[in-house]
Amino acid sequence: MSEAEARPTNFIRQIIDEDLASGKHTTVHTRFPPEPNGYLHIGHAKSICLNFGIAQDYKGQCNLRFDDTNPVKEDIEYVESIKNDVEWLGFHWSGNVRYSSDYFDQLHAYAIELINKGLAYVDELTPEQIREYRGTLTQPGKNSPYRDRSVEENLALFEKMRTGGFEEGKACLRAKIDMASPFIVMRDPVLYRIKFAEHHQTGNKWCIYPMYDFTHCISDALEGITHSLCTLEFQDNRRLYDWVLDNITIPVHPRQYEFSRLNLEYTVMSKRKLNLLVTDKHVEGWDDPRMPTISGLRRRGYTAASIREFCKRIGVTKQDNTIEMASLESCIREDLNENAPRAMAVIDPVKLVIENYQGEGEMVTMPNHPNKPEMGSRQVPFSGEIWIDRADFREEANKQYKRLVLGKEVRLRNAYVIKAERVEKDAEGNITTIFCTYDADTLSKDPADGRKVKGVIHWVSAAHALPVEIRLYDRLFSVPNPGAADDFLSVINPESLVIKQGFAEPSLKDAVAGKAFQFEREGYFCLDSRHSTAEKPVFNRTVGLRDTWAKVGE
């Protein structure tokens, strides 16, 4: 299969293929232009994979440009976080990081050009009046009384705006297009507004800042972008994108193409709603493992490869749709099943004593991966007192229960066959200790007399156990579309985080943050980067061994 045949196909790539074949473009140049006012989420990952992936596949370039035109909401913290997320996902931008603020001088000059052409004017309507004059989807707007000012007056007033002669909200620069346009975005949109705020890149040089629609298209043109890719909500804005470039003196005119945004079940993508979750402390921060942010997914244990694979599978279309959470979980589950070393941890422990076991203990050999001998093996301590999971023992059970039952046998993973003889309980009737015997001739082999022992359970030697905190993360919301609820906070899943105190095999004391393990028979976990200590490691559940929500959706 050729390199071209191996590429994913979608309507954007078909457009690029046609542009290259016709000679319209000889190279491909894309960009990823986030606003640095929050943390990137899984929806941004789709755009990152699309823009950087196209540049990679067509041996072109992709710029990282920060759309930093609103200093009130932006911060250098977000700039650094976004750069880190892009690199973590496995992509590299072309040349230096770019900022829309790099072009503030040129943007100002282009605004003056529009004024000189009679295509922009300074308006002194209040923001509320501008909204009122704009009209509705069914009613045309009406002209501002300031719309027909002379070029000279507009130039003088725009300079007054630039030098701080107006208070915030008292004046703005608007394009002069058509207040009766069926597209509200074309009804004399605001191009510049006043903000007396220090900018993280330009300091206090400016007190007027360009709007997104004016900045975006000019920045694309100045950078030589060939294909400007954005989500469907900007479809109508393409008319303004083209209008600006058609009416200024600029040699390059990129084209904008829209694709559907990523909607994912059981979460929200709105920056406002995500911010509310953080500020109201429903989660512990933007990197909370339940958040759809890239930093949250990373802390939970998602790999960059699994997110890239997810973006590849969902594809690029023009139709909005909602992706099942199971699709994302299946990508990380497949990745970790293939690549994560195995380990044993008991999440809900109960003591098990092997009464006929002699000696202080021994080491048993365990493979790090059952299907990958190249991943090697490890030595795990075994002793006469172990921890097993409470769910792995019953005093009575039916034939479908393949774990330890009173009076019956089960195999301990990679160790011996044991038989439950009796139990000890506390005053409330809870089992505190299970007493067993073991068959000393069954270390990693079947009983000599040929009897069949079907069940296998995991365990941890009590004398060598590493105390661990286990954080069982689940979906943040209890309904597939929380954004549709009257109050999305009312459908937060109360069991989205369950904290357990358990025990793990001692090899896990060397675990590093972000490194994934399969806790045998439990799921995939990674060491938490925020709360773990040498004395008390904290492990986050990334995903279960199987989709436990499958029946919920049926």
Swiss-Prot record:
Disulfide bonds: none annotated. One of its GO terms (biological process) is glutamyl-tRNA aminoacylation. It is found in: Cytoplasm. It catalyses: tRNA(Gln) + L-glutamine + ATP = L-glutaminyl-tRNA(Gln) + AMP + diphosphate. It comes from Escherichia coli (strain SMS-3-5 / SECEC). It comes from the Bacteria. A motif ('HIGH' region) lies at residues 34-44. Monomer. Keywords: Aminoacyl-tRNA synthetase, ATP-binding, Cytoplasm, Ligase, Nucleotide-binding, Protein biosynthesis. This is Glutamine--tRNA ligase. PANTHER family: GLUTAMATE--TRNA LIGASE (PTHR43097:SF5), GLUTAMINE-TRNA LIGASE (PTHR43097). Gene3D superfamilies: Glutamyl-trna Synthetase, Domain 2 (1.10.1160.10), Glutamyl-tRNA Synthetase, Domain 3 (3.90.800.10), HUPs (3.40.50.620), Ribosomal Protein L25, Chain P (2.40.240.10). It holds the Pfam family tRNA-synt_1c_C2. ATP binds at residues 35-37, 41-47, 231, 261-262, 269-271. A motif ('KMSKS' region) lies at residues 268-272. Its EC number is 6.1.1.18. Residues 317-324 are annotated as: Interaction with tRNA.
